[in-house]
From Swiss-Prot:
Pfam family, one: adh_short
Gene3D superfamilies: NAD(P)-binding Rossmann-like Domain (3.40.50.720)
Enzyme class, first EC level, given as a word: oxidoreductase
Compartments reported by the entry: Plastid, Chloroplast
UniProt name for this protein: Protochlorophyllide reductase B, chloroplastic
A single BP term in Gene Ontology: photosynthesis
InterPro entries named in the record: NAD(P)-bd_dom_sf, Prochl_reduct, SDR_fam
Functional note: Phototransformation of protochlorophyllide (Pchlide) to chlorophyllide (Chlide).
A cellular-component GO term for this protein: chloroplast
Source organism (scientific name): Hordeum vulgare
Length: 395
């Protein structure tokens, strides 16, 4: 299963504080951008918000100015400038592995979009990501206001946005009752689909304005939402039905918490959200590829059986699932390998085809995979798009 690590959805430990000509502060070897000040309390680290116009947080030694084009070579030709890629959920798992692979290439600056600054800063240092190769900006996909603020903060960096990777996800397979986002949506669909939908729509103009040779929007999919596969047929199967739950708001009060209007099932909610992700990618392609030149793609990088996304599963599952994938199904891939595969979809010239769902064979070669009938239903994609626009306030 192409499952991505997702962090807990508690409020962030950081918020921005505007102080005029504030000086940079150092904390655990990480520099905070202008406008941030930390207070230590018995409960941990906090900031006090004075002005809601927050600014982005920079990694240690990262320059505030955007990467620029490389000067002309002796032959008189300009080389391609460093690309800038936003990755959601980059503090662990697939997101962190992808951020590391891109940063280590020397060709990319990574904007790590995460809820917890300190966790992300420590993870980047532990992974050995080069100093100056990344910027950490707060994003909580369980809040549409946070998504909008993130877009404002990223634009304050004055960097062109060349690639957006929608990777973060929440998975609650053992939950008996639904939990909800700040906006009242069932958590899995609210974070995995609606939060990313708003983010991608808001950043589309930035991608369109990019002068990078190959600008891309990538939404991580999952084999579990693809019912034309063996894994996709493991109960409960993904099924969006007639979208009656989505149309009613997924709030579990005046409507069902599930997209199809059925009773809540945490595992199915995740799978349904991944179907929405794959439908959304295709609808982006149909609506905007020709106009913008942006490549829209999804992928299944392989089964990352050790990912932290399984932390809410029962202990026996967490114990047995990795060896089962390694030795029985042979579908296991490490976080490092999966990160390299996602980095390929970000940067490889051979993977520029738009509207594609990428997978890898046993020889680690990429290929265009087929989607199930539901995950490729153009009419359902249109309906999901239009309902999502209303739910996130774009229509």
């Amino acid at each position: 299963m192409a499952l991505q690590a997702a962090t807990s959805f508690l409020p962030s430990a950081l918020s921005a504080r505007k102080e005029g000509a504030a000086k940079d502060s150092a904390f655990f070897g990480v520099r905070l951008a202008d406008g941030l000040k930390l207070d230590a309390t018995s409960l941990g680290l906090r900031t006090k918000r004075v002005n809601t116009s927050s600014v982005a947080i920079r990694a240690q030694a990262a320059a505030v100015s955007a990467p620029t084009a490389t000067p002309a070579s002796p032959a008189g030709k300009k080389t391609v400038r460093t690309g800038n890629a936003i990755i959601t959920g980059a503090s662990s798992g697939l997101g962190l592995a992808t951020a590391k692979a891109l940063a280590e290439s020397g060709k990319w600056h990574v904007i790590m979009a995460c809820r917890d600054y300190l966790k992300t800063a420590r993870a980047a240092r532990a992974a050995g990501m080069p100093k100056g190769s990344y910027t950490i900006v707060h994003l909580d996909l369980a809040s549409l206001d946070s998504v909008r603020q993130f877009v404002k903060n990223v634009r304050q960096l004055d960097m062109p946005i060349d690639v957006v990777v929608c990777n973060a996800a929440v998975y609650q397979p053992t939950a008996k009752e639904p939990s909800f986002t700040a906006d009242g949506f069932e958590m899995s669909v609210g974070v995995n689909h609606l939060g990313h939908f708003l983010l991608a729509r808001e950043l589309l103009e930035d991608l369109k304005a990019s002068d990078y040779p190959s600008k891309r929007l990538i939404i991580v999919g999952s084999i579990t939402g693809n019912t034309n596969t063996l894994a996709g047929n493991v109960p409960p199967k993904a099924n969006l039905g007639d979208l009656r739950g989505l149309a009613a708001g997924l709030n579990g009060v005046g409507s069902a918490a599930m997209i199809d209007g059925a009773e809540f099932d945490g595992a199915k909610a995740y799978k349904d959200s991944k179907v929405c992700n794959m439908l959304t990618m295709q609808e982006f392609h149909r609506r905007y590829h020709e106009e913008t030149g942006v490549t829209f793609a999804s992928l299944y990088p392989g089964c990352i059986a050790t990912t932290g996304l399984f932390r809410e599963h029962i202990p026996l599952f967490r114990l047995l699932f990795p060896p089962f994938q390694k030795y029985i199904t042979k579908g296991y891939v490490s976080e490092e390998e999966a990160g390299k595969r996602l980095a390929q979809v970000v940067s490889e010239p051979s993977l520029t085809k738009s509207g594609v769902y990428w997978s890898w064979n046993k020889n680690s070669a990429s290929f265009e995979n087929q989607l199930s009938e539901e995950a490729s239903d153009t009419e359902k994609a249109r309906k999901v798009w239009e309902l999502s626009e209303k739910l996130v306030g774009l229509a």
